[in-house]
Amino acid sequence: YSKSLTHIGHSEKMLFMRLFIAVLILIFTLPTPSQADDIRDFQIEGMSVGDSMLDFLSEEKIKDNIQDFYKNNEFIPVWIEGSYFKSTMYEKIEFNYKNGDKNYIIYSISGLNFPKNINDCYEKQIEILNDLDEMFADVKGIQKMNIEKYRHTIDKSGKSTFTRGGLIFDTGGAITVDCNDFSNEVESKDEMYISIDTKEFTKFLNSDPY
């Protein structure tokens, strides 16, 4: 996949901007931010952590779209095309459920897009996180996660990075915005993630799962 940082046409840039401005409307479906005391109050395309994937997908559809990018199998990732949910905001939706859970309870849900220019991802990441900071500035029990860049352990060459910022709830769950910048050593497009994660899944991510 190309990692070229070439100029994106004006129309593509405007589309990219509209997608991520609309992200905030999609995620935050509460009447007021002051009611946002539980990570389960937030949704992506009408779905959230704690829901069963079976409410939205058949078991066959789930099994047909399982991914394999964790080095252990505590959680199972599933990628579904955004168009399946009639999404105009995300190219893919990622779910994570616990291995062996026949109810397919969602522990993490993300909306994904694949920016052609990683710098556009960084710009939109800052805008979204600034909006979130303002929206929840007076809400107790929420801690800001400043933007930081890390090496992505999926790339053993050490050339790939992910940049993350977000909000951490006192219950341990988190809302994060990530830009994944993959090197040519990794057969993957660059990614922008908007994620809702439970405390348990956040702990899993911090355990170097790749």
Identify the function of each model-found stretch.
Residues L19-P31:
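Sec-dependent N-terminal signal peptides
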Residues E81-I105:
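Compositionally biased P/S/T/G-rich terminal and signal peptide-adjacent segments
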Residues L15-R18, Y193:
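Position-driven detector of the extreme protein N-terminus
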Residues Y1-F16:
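Short, Lys/Arg-enriched N-terminal segments with co-localized hydrophobic residues
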Residues H7, L30-P33:
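N-terminal compositionally biased, intrinsically disordered segments and leader/signal-like regions
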Residues A36-W79, N103-Y210:
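Non-cytosolic coordination micro-motifs
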